[in-house]
A protein has these predicted regions:
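Acidic, Ser/Thr- and proline-rich intrinsically disordered linker/docking segments
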Residues: 2-35, 45-51, 68-131
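Polybasic phosphoinositide-binding surfaces of eukaryotic membrane-targeting domains
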Residues: 50-63
Length: 131
């Protein structure tokens, strides 16, 4: 069951979350996919499947959102209990994250270099608590 925008905005404010360039549309629709009682732990943006996606980590799952330019929205998710490993690498300008869940890898590229290590650690800790 989706929550109202205020619920999500309050959680993002507690995290001192900044609006991320390139995922403003997705942030506006995040309340449509967050469930009542689900807590947002962090978020960032990354490049996946040819597009820039919002990646939101909650206490239950990792949610990926890609809002189309004019219409449509794509959503993917990984339940934290299914995450078996998460790895990152950084380069000069950015970083990449690889999440292994259910025997398959999801690779997220072009992440902010400042975010990639923190997001990797956040997912690892949340997955450990969820299993």
């Amino acid at each position: 069951m989706a929550v109202d925008k205020e619920y999500v905005e309050k959680q993002l404010a507690k995290l001192n979350a900044k609006k991320r360039l390139g995922v403003g549309k997705e942030l506006k629709h995040l309340h449509e996919v967050i469930n009542k009682g689900e807590n947002i732990l962090g978020h960032t943006r990354g490049f996946y499947n040819g597009n820039t996606w919002l990646m939101c980590i909650t206490d239950r799952r990792i949610v990926f959102l890609d809002k189309g330019m004019i219409y449509g929205m794509k959503q993917a998710e990984i339940p934290l209990k299914n995450v078996s490993s998460v790895n990152y690498e950084t380069g000069i300008l950015g970083g990449n994250l690889t999440i292994t869940a259910g025997g398959s890898d999801k690779k997220i590229g072009k992440m902010r270099k400042q975010d990639v290590k923190d997001i990797c650690n956040l997912i690892s800790e949340a997955a450990e608590k969820a299993s």
